[in-house]
Amino acid sequence: MKKVCHLTSVHQRDDIRIFHKECKSLQHIYEISLVVADGRGDDVVDGIIIYDVGKPSARWERMILTTKRVYKKALMLDADIYHFHDPELIPIGLKLLKKNKKVIYDVHEDVPKQLLSKPYLNKFILKIISNAFKKYENKSAKKFTAIITVVPEITNRLKQFNDKTVEIRNYPKLNEFAKINVQWKDRENAMVYIGSISEIRGIYEMMQVAYKANIKLHLAGNFSTPALESDLQNHKEWQQVIYHGVISRDNVVELLSKVKIGLLLLHPVPNHLIGLNTKIFEYLAAGLPIIASDMLHYKEIIEVNNCGFCINPFDIDAIV
């Protein structure tokens, strides 16, 4: 049986796309291993072997030392195919190609556009970095065995450099939601947001909506920084938040089955203008109407199918 090794220096071991969709889908025909850097130790989960190279204490450590640890572990495992999920692992992927390995690059985000939204550098420098990375990614794309993308914009760009570029969208597994049997009218009059928690993903606006409407906001996921978590908890609006932490897939489904509204108030930064957030499909699968940002690709799904509203995410009064 051929061996496939997934590599990530950023994502958690129970990442939905990586572990639950890709690793589990492949394990029936391949021997699957997953290399992570989340600090939770080695493990075997559902027959998938997980190797942990240790959680970095800072971004610089992750970019420099963790990537080296991932590469060292990858070499030790001697897989037939390597499938990596983070742009910072591109150099690792290129090194593995030189070892005559097949290497797949899984592009979860439009990184050049994502870089334009980073808060810790000025716009001029960000534009230079974004353009430089785009050239580097395009050049590297030519060399990989295959590329997997999530949205047409990324697919169209990278397919110019590698014709083995395939788009696999991040849709939910509907069988996870089949057990929901709570009628909408019987659910708690509350809202929910599940996912990465950050300023550009609208956390402050969601809290303001909950506070002004005087209804609870159920929140689950990772905070982008400890400083953000601390700041949020010091706001008066936090009293309307019920924070569940990082929760399992079963608990995600359970939480979505208890509330009445799904929120997705993303800020209109470049990466959000093309990316299609998986949460809207999970909300719909759970029978939730959605309040989302007024971006065209969300309007085409939500408003056309009459399953919610798309509103300016900064207009709190209109949302309420």
Model-derived features: where do they sit?
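Conserved donor-binding/catalytic core segment of Leloir-type glycosyltransferases
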Residues: 5-7, 148, 184-218
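Membrane-proximal helix-turn-helix segments that form the acceptor-binding/catalytic region
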Residues: 22-24, 68-75, 95, 105, ...
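Short N-terminal targeting/anchoring amphipathic segment
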Residues: 73-90, 101-104
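Short hydrophobic beta-strand element within catalytic cores of glycosyltransferases
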Residues: 261-264, 282-292
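Nucleotide-activated donor-binding/catalytic signature segment of Leloir-type glycosyltransferases, i.e.
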Residues: 218-221, 229-254
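N-terminal subdomain of nucleotide-sugar transferases
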Residues: 1-40, 46, 146-148, 152, ...
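Conserved acidic donor-binding segment of nucleotide-sugar-dependent glycosyltransferases
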Residues: 304-305, 309-316
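Donor nucleotide-sugar binding/catalytic pocket of nucleotide-sugar-dependent glycosyltransferases
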Residues: 51-52, 127-179, 186
